[in-house]
Amino acid sequence: MSKSLIHPSDLRAGLADIEMADETVDLVYKNLSEGQAHLQGEPFDIKDLPEGVSKLQISDNVRSDTSPNEYSDEDDEEGEDEYEEVYDPVSAFQDFLDETGSYLISKLKKGEKIKKTWSEVSRVIYSYVMSNFPPRPPKPTTKDIAVQADLKKPNEIQKISEHKSKSEPSPREPVVEMHKHATLENPEDDEGALESEIAHQVAESYSKKYKFPSKSSGIFLWNFEQLKMNLDDIVQVARGVPGISQIVERGGKLPLRCMLGYVGLETSKRFRSLVNQDKLCKLMQEDLNAYSVSSNN
């Protein structure tokens, strides 16, 4: 029997994982639909509005110094805004799932096991969902609202203490302690967000080929798939590229060709045998400079 055949137990396990993934996609779609109910013309609860909306006032006063030309320009701008394409996160997520499914099928056709491939794909889907659809905080219950209302009722003792606190400077030691506590917790969240964003952008271009200078004074094509590494390992090595964390913090696109060259030099003997390292270092520096400038803008 050929070693390339897939065991039936692996197929059953893979089908079960795919069914679970479908249920997860349906759940995410349902949550998105409920979250966008107000865009579909469905009524929504007034409690969901931000605080301070009730304080807004609509003024009927029109500036007398406004010329008719200004009104026409404003109308034209409003008309152009109406024809602008609205970003739909559901369709973007569906496109991402289609690309991920194509990648999964291509890996299975090459003879890779479903367990290994699905674990990698599931991490990519999880990072995409966490980066694009962060969980919403739970709504306060009526009991919490009642407790907050009771706490806000001032009595005479509180009024006296507030009056004294206004006349005397308040100590800032608790604020410093809270700030220190927050700075101790932020690094773990930042590390997770950094790895998720790198994994997301690498997964989107996993099979895309990039041009690299070869030792024979020409070029050759290479992609992340040819590294034959897990996505987690690629992310860990790519984090060593200088300036990557700053680009992610500014929400810019990552220099994927530079990252691919860096990971290839660190892990792939075949890549090192093909590439002209002097030209590659210059190319990587140019990519870093260009993407750093674009992320600042």
Swiss-Prot record:
Post-translational modification (record): Phosphorylated by host PKC and by an unknown kinase.
MF term (GO), any: RNA-directed RNA polymerase activity
Pfam families referenced in this protein's UniProt entry, alphabetically: PP_M1
GO cellular component: host cell cytoplasm; virion component
Sorted UniProt keywords: Chaperone, Host cytoplasm, Host-virus interaction, Inhibition of host innate immune response by virus, Inhibition of host interferon signaling pathway by virus, Inhibition of host STAT1 by virus, Inhibition of host STAT2 by virus, Interferon antiviral system evasion, Phosphoprotein, Viral immunoevasion, Viral RNA replication, Virion
Biased composition, class Acidic residues, residue ranges: 71-83
A GO biological process held by the record: symbiont-mediated suppression of host JAK-STAT cascade via inhibition of STAT2 activity
Ranges spanned by the short sequence motif Nuclear export signal, renumbered to the chain: 49-58
Span of the annotated motif Nuclear localization signal: 208-211
Sites of Phosphoserine modification: S64, S207, S268
Polar residues: compositionally biased ranges: 57-69
Gene3D superfamilies recorded: 6.10.140.1560, Phosphoprotein, C-terminal domain
Stretches the record annotates as Disordered: 57-83, 153-176
Subunit structure: Homotrimer when phosphorylated. This trimer is stabilized by binding to the L protein. Binds soluble protein N, and ribonucleocapsid. Interacts with host STAT1, STAT2 and PML.
Role of this protein: Non catalytic polymerase cofactor and regulatory protein that plays a role in viral transcription and replication. Stabilizes the RNA polymerase L to the N-RNA template and binds the soluble protein N, preventing it from encapsidating non-genomic RNA. Also inhibits host IFN-alpha and IFN-beta signaling by binding and retaining phosphorylated STAT1 in the cytoplasm or by inhibiting the DNA binding of STAT1 in the nucleus.
Family, as annotated: Belongs to the lyssavirus protein P family.
Name of the protein: Phosphoprotein
Organism whose genome encodes this protein: West Caucasian bat virus (WCBV)
